[in-house]
Amino acid sequence: MSRGKKTVERVVELMKDPKHIRNIGIVAHIDHGKTTLSDNLLAGAGIISEELAGKQLFMDSDAEEQARGITIDASNVSMVHEVEGQDYLINMIDTPGHVDFGGDVTRAMRAVDGAVVLVDAVEGTMPQTETVLRQALKEQVRPVLFINKVDRLVNELKVDETEMQIRLGKVIDKVNKLIKGMNEDLYNNGWKLDASKGTVAFGSALYNWAVSVPYMKKGGVSFKDVFEKCRAGDMKYLAKNSPLYEVVLDMVVHHLPNPLEAQPRRVNVIWHGDHSTKEGKAMLACDPNGPATMMVTDISFDPHAGEVATGRLFSGTLRRGDGLYVMGSAKKENRLQQVGIFMGPKRVEVEEIVAGNIAAVTGLKDAIVGSTVTSLMEMSPFESLKHYSEPVMTVAVEAKNMKDLPKLVEVLRQVAKEDPTLGIAINEETGEHLISGMGELHLEIVTGRIKRDKGVEIVTSEPIVVYRETVTGKVEDVEGKSPNRHNRFYFTLEPLPEEIVNLIKAGEITMNQQAIERRDVLLKAGMDKDEAKNVKHIKGTNMLIDMTKGIQYLNETMELIIEGINEALAGGPLADEPVQNLKMTLTDVKLHEDAIHRGPAQVIPAVRGAIKGGMLIAGDSLLEPVQKIQISVPMDQMGAATSQIQGRRGQVFDMQSEGDTITVVGKAPVAELFGFAGDIRSATEGRAMWNTEFAGFELVPNNLVKDVVVAIRKRKGLKEQMPTPSDYLSV
C-alpha cells in the first residue's frame, strides 16, 4: 500500500477521536519562513519527499505563488504525528504573511484552535507578526512560538553563544509583550510563552532542524551544539539529531488544545446564540451526534467538482447526501455531493467527517466565505469574520471582447465568493466593473488570475484610491419629504463616537446579539440609556437610532426607512463614496394613513434625500486610507528614508536603532504611495527593507478636499460642481 494511501486511512481513523486532533495555523510576517516550515513538517509526516521539501513549496500550489515566492491563499493539509506511542491528527493551515492577503489569515483563524507563530531570529517581530497575533487572540486561538533562521544569527551577524541566547530571549519577551498588551487575561491564564515550559522552539526551517528545552533534555542537543554546528555549517547533524518536524509537532501536541478543550472557550466568542439550545450544547461539547454546524472559511473552484466549501465543523457529522441549510440565504436545502479533507492541493474523499475537524465539501451552492451552514432550518449565525484591513484601492476591469462580458460577470461573482476581502461592484449597464482590494499586489494577483485561471481577456485601469465620506458637525431635525408630500421624516445627524465605532469594528456591537447585551455594551461606552435601547440598524460603522414615540404605521414602514438609509450610505452626497461613522437619530415621522401613499417609491427617496442633504449641512467631508510604513535602512540612509515618508504628505512618528540599522516608522496616505517601491529603492540605493500595513481612514486636508471631490465626480460621470443641500432636500 502506498504511503499516501496509508496516511489517508490513518487520518480517517483519527478524525473520529477529537482528543487526538489538533487544528493549527502557521502565521507570520512575510518571508519569515512559514511555507518552508509547513513543507518540512509535511516531509516529516511523509506527505512529500524530504529532498523536495522547502523547494517544492507544496503548500504554494498556485503558479503565481511559486513565481512570486510568497503565499497568497491559505492552504490546508491533514497529517499524522506520533508522540509517545500515540498517533495524533494534525490539520494544518499555512497562511499568507503579506499584508495584502490578511483576509486569508482572518478566515484561517476561525477554523483552527492553535497557532504556531513564526518569527525570524534576525528581523524579530514585524508589523504583520503583530497583526496575525492580534487576529489569533481575537478568535481565542492559542499561540506557541517558533523562532526561525537561528543559523543567520551565527553566520551573518556573527554573534557568540551568549549573545545568541540574549537575542532569542529578546524575541520571546517582545512576543509576550504583544500578547499581554492585546489580552492580559489570557496572558495571565497560562498563555505567556515560556521556553522552559516548552511553548517556544528555535531552529531553521530551511535546514530542517529545531530545538526546544524539553527536546534538549530528551535528545541531548544543547545550545552549545547549536552554536558550534551552525558556525561549522554542519546542519545535517542538527537535522538528524533534532529534526524540525518532531520538535515542532511535539510542541503542538503538548501545548495546543484539542477541539474538546478549545470549543467551550471559542464558541463563547464566535457565536452569540443561546447556549442552552441543542446546537449551543452540541458546539460547546464538540458533539458528533448533535446537529451539524459548520462555518465556511474558504471557497475554491475545482474544474471537475465545482465549488468546494472548506470550513470548521463545530458539531454533528457530515455525510454524502446530507441536506444542509445556509443561514441568511433562501431556506432551501443544499445537498452534499462529496465530503472530503485536503492534503495540500489534493482533496481526498472520505465517508464522513465528525465534529472538531476541517471539512471540504461540495454541493453547498448558496454558501459564501463566512456562511453558517447547519442541518437545522434555523439557527443564530456565527459572528461574521472581522478583517483588520479594508479595501483601499480599486481598479476598473472591462472585457476585451464584448462577447466575454457575461463570462466576466460570472467570473467576478466567483472571485467575490472566493475572497471576501475584495469589494466587487458589477455594473451590467456600462460594462465597467470595479474590483477593490487591499493594495497594488492584491489587485495585480486577482486580475492576473482572472486572465490566467478563468480564461477571460480583460483590460484594467490604473489603480484608484478608495475614499469614504463622513460628517464633521451636527445637524438637528433635517426634514425629508416624500415625492407626494404626504410623508415626512426628521433626522438628527452627527459623528458616531470613536469608542462605539471601534466596538462595532471589533464585533462587540452587532445586530445579531440580544438587545439587552447590545444596550449594556453601549451604556458602558457612554451612550445615553434611551438611545442605547433603541438601536434599529447598524450598517458598516453607521448606526440608526429610533427616538420617536407612538407613531402609527411606523413599524411596518421601518424596513423601507432602513432601505433608504442603506442607499444613502452606499454613496454619500459629496463624491458618491461609502459613508462611515455616522450616527442617525430618527426624531419624528409623519405618515399618510393609507398604505398605498407610503410605499417604497415614497419612503425610500424621502429618507435617502434627508440623509444626503443633512450630511452636507452637517459638514460632509472625505476620509482617505492611510498606511503605516516601516523602513529599515543603514544609519547613513536615514535622511533618504524619512524624506520618502515626509515628501508624501506623511509623518514620521518613531525611530528605533539597533546596531548600525535604523527603523523609521511613519504613516502616509495611500493616494501618495503609488510607485513607493521604486522610489524608496532608488533613494536608498536598494538597501531599504520596508513594509506597510493598513492604519485606518483619516480626514483629507481641507485645502485638498475640493480637488479630490471634483476629480472623483468627473471620473464617475457626475456633475462636476460641488453639490448643495437643496439638491437633495425638497423645499
Curated annotation (Swiss-Prot):
Q: Where is the tr-type G domain?
A: 19-260
InterPro entries assigned to the protein according to its UniProt record, in alphabetical order = EFG_II, EFG_III/V, EFG_V-like, EFTu-like_2, G_TR_CS, P-loop_NTPase, Ribosomal_Su5_D2-typ_SF, Ribsml_uS5_D2-typ_fold_subgr
Q: Which PANTHER family match?
A: ELONGATION FACTOR-LIKE GTPASE 1 (PTHR42908:SF3), TRANSLATION ELONGATION FACTOR-RELATED (PTHR42908)
Source organism per entry reads Methanoregula boonei (strain DSM 21154 / JCM 14090 / 6A8)
Which SUPFAM superfamilies did the record assign?
Answer: EF-G C-terminal domain-like, P-loop containing nucleoside triphosphate hydrolases, Ribosomal protein S5 domain 2-like, Translation proteins
Q: For this protein, what is any one GO molecular function term? A: GTP binding
For binding GTP, which residues are annotated in this chain's numbering?
A: 28-35, 94-98, 148-151
| Keywords, sorted A to Z | Cytoplasm, Elongation factor, GTP-binding, Nucleotide-binding, Protein biosynthesis
Briefly, what is this protein's role?
Catalyzes the GTP-dependent ribosomal translocation step during translation elongation. During this step, the ribosome changes from the pre-translocational (PRE) to the post-translocational (POST) state as the newly formed A-site-bound peptidyl-tRNA and P-site-bound deacylated tRNA move to the P and E sites, respectively. Catalyzes the coordinated movement of the two tRNA molecules, the mRNA and conformational changes in the ribosome.
PROSITE patterns per UniProt: G_TR_1 (PS00301), G_TR_2 (PS51722)
Q: Which family does it belong to?
A: Belongs to the TRAFAC class translation factor GTPase superfamily. Classic translation factor GTPase family. EF-G/EF-2 subfamily.
Q: According to the UniProt entry, which residues carry Diphthamide?
A: 597
Q: Which domain of life is it from?
A: Archaea
Per the record, its GO cellular-component terms are: cytosol; ribonucleoprotein complex
**Chief location of this protein?**
cytoplasm
Record protein name field: Elongation factor 2
Give the matching SMART domains: EFG_C, EFG_IV
Compartments where found? Cytoplasm
